[in-house]
Amino acid sequence: MVEDIIIVSTPYVPGYKITKTYGFTWGLIVRSRGIGGNIIASLRTIFGGEIHEYTELLNQSRQYALDRMKQHAREMGANAVVSVGFDSSDIGQNMSEVLAFGTAVTVEPETAASSPVRLG
């Protein structure tokens, strides 16, 4: 895992100001479900309910994509990624693609002088 990269889904980081924008950053992974997982999943679709094998595969894939996005942002010189989102799709019948994306930025803690005054 890439540490020390702030990740938020909002276009700003609360308590920080953006001092530099590097641009679009992403992390992508394509994973195969495998024949064993497909057989088990096919059996589960007959009876209904959650397909745990696919859920775990997609959770792992999201984490890998997020880690790759963080690494890409770090290579760009960023210490944060704002406006983070995910996208996923199937490729063929046995593969899934997961994309993590956002805007790589440098942020610094806001000082009391630069913080907006909030009333009430």
From Swiss-Prot:
Organism superkingdom: Archaea
* Family indicated by similarity: Belongs to the UPF0145 family.
PANTHER family, alphabetized: UPF0145 PROTEIN SCO3412, UPF0145 PROTEIN YBJQ
The name this protein goes by in its record: UPF0145 protein UNCMA_30400
